[in-house]
Each structure stands twice: as structure tokens, then as C-alpha cells.
Regions:
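N-terminal glycine-/serine-/threonine-rich phosphate-binding loop
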Residues: 1-32, 36-54
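Short glycine/serine/threonine-rich phosphate/pyrophosphate-binding segments
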Residues: 16-17, 84, 129
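Glycine-rich nucleotide/cofactor/substrate-binding loop typically near the N-terminus or early
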Residues: 36-107
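Short, basic, glycine/proline-bearing loop/turn elements
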Residues: 3-7, 70-77, 116-117
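General beta-strand structural signal in soluble alpha/beta enzymes
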Residues: 9-10, 30-35, 49-53, 78, ...
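Internal alpha/beta core interface subdomains
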Residues: 2-5, 94-185
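Short, flexible, solvent-exposed loop/turn segments with mixed acidic/basic and small polar residues
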Residues: 18-21, 62-68, 131-134
Length: 185
């Protein structure tokens, strides 16, 4: 187990976010976030780096492209025990991302609540599922959280393990995340 140093948070459902942020802050975990989540974190008075500042690339296409960046996905997908991956990260100045907290745009809810085709289309999440897939694929090194109901389990796991997560916990969260992505798609 390795201590979580950096978390990427991008959530449409902001319920219980403050509770999670309190724990992450106490553990001195660096926060990276985008869009509305970044604004919410700042409003709650937590220190956070905006994704565009973190990557050095602005959000583009009216916010359609925020987290689809090699610095994000390299930091999530890198195998911590593979020297070539560590060399690539170092060469490109891509820090590891150890925790990914993402839930998706409410596509299904939007689909059932409006006939506005443009609104429906804009609620199809691209970056969120990509980050969740990446974190789930790399469950040996990265913890993925997809729903606020999992925050209490994560908080407990981090407290019991001094800011770390066990492989069993990461595996369980990864399985739930893959199921959510499959359902969302």
C-alpha cells in the first residue's frame, strides 16, 4: 500500500463532497478538479488546483474537453512498479494521480426530463467515463470512487490505513466502477 498523495475530483453529484474533502484535506492529499466541481471546492474553502492550470491546457469547446489530457491519463494509468512508466512520467512532468473521484453527467435523468436534443447531447459524459475506465484498469495503484454513497467507505479505509487503500478495497471499487461505466454506456 502506498499513501494517496493526489486526488482528481470531477463530480456532477456534489452531495457529501464537503465530508470527503475534510478527510482528504486532513491527510494532506492534493486536490485537482475541473469546472463546477472546482468552483464548489473553492466555495467550500478547500485548496485545489484547477485541471486547466494542472495540465497547462485550457478547457476548450465550451467545456467539452477538460480532462482528456495525457497528463491526467498518464498520471492515472502509470504502473507504479514499472520503471519505463516512471521514466515517462518524469520525462513529461506528469505526477501520479492516486485517487479518482468521478460521477457522470446525469444523461439518463436529462433524457427522461426533456425533449431538448441539445441539452440531452451536452449531458453525455466523455471525460468522466474515460477517467473511471483508466482508474479501474489500474486498480493495483489507483482508487476509483464513482458515487457519494462510497465516500463513507473510502473515509473509513483511509483512516484505518493511514491515508492508504488496500488492494481488496481498490478491487471492489474498480468492479463497481466498471459496472457503472457499462451501464452508463
Amino acid at each position: 500500500m502506498k499513501k494517496i498523495k493526489r486526488a482528481l475530483i470531477s463530480v456532477s453529484n456534489k452531495n457529501n463532497l464537503k465530508k470527503l474533502l475534510l478527510t482528504l484535506s486532513k491527510l494532506k492529499i492534493e486536490l485537482v478538479s475541473s469546472g463546477g466541481t472546482f468552483k464548489k471546492i473553492k466555495k467550500l474553502k478547500f485548496k485545489c488546483t484547477e485541471v486547466s492550470k494542472y495540465t497547462g491546457s485550457p478547457e476548450i469547446l465550451d467545456g467539452r474537453v477538460k480532462t482528456l489530457h495525457p497528463k491526467i491519463h498518464g498520471g492515472i494509468l502509470s504502473k507504479r512498479n514499472r520503471k519505463s512508466h516512471q521514466k515517462d512520467l518524469l520525462k513529461n512532468n506528469f505526477p501520479e494521480i492516486d485517487l479518482v473521484v468521478v460521477n457522470f453527467y446525469p444523461f439518463e435523468k436529462t433524457l427522461t426530463s426533456t425533449n431538448n436534443h441539445s441539452k440531452i447531447i451536452e449531458n453525455i459524459d466523455i471525460g468522466g467515463p474515460a477517467m473511471v475506465r483508466a482508474a479501474s484498469k489500474n486498480y493495483n495503484d489507483v482508487t476509483v470512487i464513482i458515487d457519494p454513497y462510497q465516500y463513507d467507505d473510502l473515509i473509513k479505509e483511509l483512516k484505518v490505513n493511514n491515508g492508504k487503500t488496500t488492494k481488496n478495497f481498490r478491487t471492489k471499487m474498480s468492479e463497481e466502477a466498471f459496472s457503472e461505466v457499462a451501464y452508463y454506456d
